[in-house]
């Protein structure tokens, strides 16, 4: 089974798709691997990892709170890193995921780290036969879901701009990939016609469809903690689409569409016959003034802390990485 990478914006259904694929007998997909972001660099692709840096990476992984969410015994992999003098970046990444794969008694592995879309060039150099699945969701539902999980995301103009930008970046990365190795899936299609959509994904991944994939929710508590949406602990429900129609105010709908309407239409999402008012423009300006610096600070702070943690071989000290699954693998 070729490695499968799921990418997308936050709150777009990446976890749902991960759990569906993870319910297949041949594929194991752990929690997010943002902790690998500092290592997915061309200098490591060319020169590999060796000496003191490799030792620090082993220590970094051992205490990383996000890696702990993978919920398996990684001690053998950590020991193997400590016993080596050098390792290629491919062997490190492949070995890490294979160690999880073996613990799950699966034949192949995948990844669900939405932000890896920024590193697709490096990932495809590491794994030329990898399959990339981009899952997209109506941005207005993304905004509504995100602000429910994190009150600091309650800036409709900022989220609309970020959603539009990230999809542009994903599209730009995917444009360099041959058609047979990339696929775009709408979250809404996954809910409306699950059997057909999942069968198509299986064909793309080169694996047979298994009915057990539709019962993914029966084992969700082995693979995700309660910090995720409650929806992934139950069966697929088409009613969970397009909630923005009831939850967003008219002003929020006007603003989101004014900022990202072109992208909504491109992916066949409904748009309304509304135009931004002067009061909306002022609201967006206040949104951007307050929300953009906050979002930029959050992103920069997280990146800096992870980079420092790798170099020091310690914990990044990040908070709110999530809760452990209820059941141990």
Where would I find each of the regions flagged by the language model?
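P-loop (Walker A) phosphate-binding loop of NTP-binding proteins
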Residues: 9
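PAPS-dependent sulfation machinery
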Residues: 29-111, 116
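Catalytic donor-sugar/metal-binding loop of nucleotide-sugar-dependent glycosyltransferases
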Residues: 25-29, 131
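PAPS-dependent sulfotransferase catalytic domain
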Residues: 97-235
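PAPS-dependent sulfotransferases, especially Golgi type II membrane carbohydrate sulfotransferases
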Residues: 1-5, 86-87, 147-150, 171-175, ...
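Anion-recognition interface
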Residues: 48-49, 53-71, 86, 117-123, ...
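A conserved segment at the C-terminal end of the G1
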Residues: 15-26
């Amino acid at each position: 089974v070729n490695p499968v990478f799921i990418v997308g914006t936050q709150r777009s259904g990446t976890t749902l798709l991960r759990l569906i694929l993870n319910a297949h007998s041949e594929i194991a997909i752990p929690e997010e691997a943002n902790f690998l972001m500092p290592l997915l660099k061309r200098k490591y692709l060319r020169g590999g990892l060796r000496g003191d840096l490799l030792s620090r990476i082993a220590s970094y992984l051992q205490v990383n709170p996000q890696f702990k969410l993978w919920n398996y015994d990684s001690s053998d992999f950590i020991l193997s890193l400590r016993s080596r003098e050098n390792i290629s970046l491919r062997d490190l990444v492949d070995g890490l995921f294979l160690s999880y794969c073996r613990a799950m008694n699966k034949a192949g592995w995948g990844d669900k780290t939405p932000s890896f879309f920024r590193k697709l060039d490096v990932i495809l150099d590491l794994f030329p036969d990898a399959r990339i699945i981009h899952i997209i969701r109506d941005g207005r539902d993304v905004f509504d879901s995100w602000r429910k999980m994190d009150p600091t995301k309650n800036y409709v103009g900022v989220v609309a701009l970020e959603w539009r930008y990230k999809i542009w970046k994903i599209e730009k990365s995917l444009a360099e990939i041959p058609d047979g190795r990339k696929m775009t899936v709408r979250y809404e299609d996954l809910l409306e016609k699950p059997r057909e959509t999942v069968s198509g994904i299986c064909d793309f991944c080169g694996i047979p469809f298994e009915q057990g994939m539709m019962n993914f929710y029966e084992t969700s508590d082995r693979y995700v903690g309660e910090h995720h949406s409650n929806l992934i602990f139950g069966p697929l429900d088409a009613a969970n689409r397009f909630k923005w129609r009831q939850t967003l105010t008219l002003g929020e709908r006007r603003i989101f569409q004014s900022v990202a309407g072109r992208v909504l239409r491109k992916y066949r999402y409904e748009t309304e016959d509304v135009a931004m008012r002067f009061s909306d423009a002022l609201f967006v300006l206040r949104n951007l003034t307050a929300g953009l610096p906050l979002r930029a600070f959050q992103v920069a702070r997280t990146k800096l802390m992870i980079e420092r943690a790798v170099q020091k071989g310690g914990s990044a000290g990040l908070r709110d990485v999530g809760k452990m699954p209820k059941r141990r693998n």
